[in-house]
């Protein structure tokens, strides 16, 4: 309850929450249709394995109280264009079940999880890398290595208040490419830093590790056990995406 007391005490800082709703933007190095065409023709890196059979599970079917705000299914993202045709979020089953446990843990404190992204087809990672200026490559995954999102073992998320349904204020907006996005950034307000710490503690308790460059990005501990996947949501088959 200490965290909620801090939220109430610092509620007067609500103007700072506007920073959370402002979408960070870049100017892609190439036109997005060109990036997409090139990425769809490219092949993911070869891997030797062995790997577990993919078992991508849709998060909201496992726990309907998990909320979605899939930025890459709209133009509300850092490139200003949709990358997905469906606003859905998947993780490998063990990671999905761990996330559900974290959500239940947070509910006891009056909060829930709001998902920005989960499994991400490899070609989208390729588009991000090729479209982002080299100076900002710290914030996008190298497609020659693949992203943990591509393995269904990374999730981008934040917290929302169960009473209001509104996301909590954090030190930066989602996908912001600046030091404010770093998980150890100390320049936020006391409230922002407390919110970030609450999210991190809940996820770490269930086997996730925060990305040092992105407070919202968490990798599941078993990510090495799964292969890179390059299948759009609408083409996922029962062998990769299963009902709970």
Task: Give the location of each predicted region.
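Bacterial N-terminal signal peptides
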Residues: 4-14
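Extracytoplasmic cell-surface/polysaccharide-interacting catalytic and binding patches
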Residues: 18-118, 131-213, 222-244
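Segments that shape or occlude catalytic/ligand-binding pockets
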Residues: 121
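Short, well-ordered surface patches within globular domains
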Residues: 124
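Structured alpha/beta reader/binder surfaces that contact nucleic acids or chromatin modification marks
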Residues: 128
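Conserved metal-phosphate-binding beta-hairpin within the catalytic cores
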Residues: 218
């Amino acid at each position: 309850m200490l965290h909620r007391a801090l939220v109430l005490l610092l509620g007067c800082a609500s103007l700072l929450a506007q920073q959370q709703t402002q979408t960070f933007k870049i100017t892609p190095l190439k036109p997005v249709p060109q990036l997409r065409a090139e990425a769809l023709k490219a092949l993911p890196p070869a891997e030797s394995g062995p790997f577990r059979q993919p078992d991508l599970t849709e998060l909201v079917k496992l726990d309907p109280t998990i909320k979605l705000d899939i930025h890459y299914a709209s133009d509300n993202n850092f490139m200003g264009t949709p990358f997905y045709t469906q606003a859905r979020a998947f993780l490998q089953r063990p990671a999905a079940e761990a996330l559900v446990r974290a959500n239940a843990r947070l509910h006891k404190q009056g909060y829930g999880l709001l998902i920005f992204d989960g499994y991400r087809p490899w070609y989208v990672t390729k588009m991000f890398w090729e479209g982002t200026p080299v100076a900002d490559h710290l914030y996008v995954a190298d497609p020659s290595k693949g992203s943990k999102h591509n393995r269904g073992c990374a999730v981008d998320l934040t917290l929302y208040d169960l009473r209001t349904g509104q996301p909590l204020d954090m030190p930066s907006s989602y996908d912001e490419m600046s030091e404010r996005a770093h998980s150890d950034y100390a320049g936020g307000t006391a409230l922002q830093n407390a919110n970030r710490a609450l999210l991190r503690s809940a996820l770490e308790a269930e086997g996730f590790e925060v990305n040092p460059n992105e407070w919202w990005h968490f990798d599941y501990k078993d990510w090495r056990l799964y292969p890179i996947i390059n299948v759009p949501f609408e083409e996922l088959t029962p062998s990769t995406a299963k009902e709970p």
